[in-house]
């Protein structure tokens, strides 16, 4: 059985650990989004837009609806991804203003983790559309079923 002081000490240690872990995860996710995912998405968007342009020249009467739909979906997703990346970056910067551990933990839970969930949702959606050779990370199938 813990004394009140021991219990409070454990509480503070666990709270501090939670804050550090979520902060590290958020910064890691932000770096992955900015340095790996967004450049890969832009590269794929460029490829699809060049494909659409080539089809217009080579086959002006051809149905380009599939390519144009992919281009539109990727472009819209990339825009939303870019915005939430900026929001996450801004929200991470605001963490330094939180000095009370419980206030910081609640901010991380209510703001940062929500930003991360939205960023993840958008990244997963774009991953579903992009061919594996464009995506910078292995997909779930590669991770689960690859033999090392």
Model-derived features: positions:
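C-terminal amphipathic alpha-helical interaction region
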Residues: 1-148
């Amino acid at each position: 059985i813990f004394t009140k002081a021991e219990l409070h000490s454990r509480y503070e240690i666990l709270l501090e650990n939670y804050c550090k872990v979520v902060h590290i995860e958020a910064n890691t996710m932000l770096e992955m989004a900015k340095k790996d995912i967004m450049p890969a998405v832009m590269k794929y968007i460029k490829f699809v837009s060049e494909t659409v342009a080539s089809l217009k020249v080579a086959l002006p009467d051809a149905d380009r609806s599939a390519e144009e739909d992919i281009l539109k979906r990727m472009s819209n997703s990339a825009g939303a991804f870019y915005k939430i990346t900026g929001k996450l970056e801004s929200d991470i910067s605001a963490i330094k203003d939180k000095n009370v551990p419980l206030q910081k933990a609640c901010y991380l839970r209510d703001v940062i983790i929500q930003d991360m969930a939205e960023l993840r949702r958008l990244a997963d959606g774009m991953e579903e559309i992009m061919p594996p050779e464009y995506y910078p990370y292995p997909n779930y199938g590669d991770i689960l079923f690859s033999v090392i």
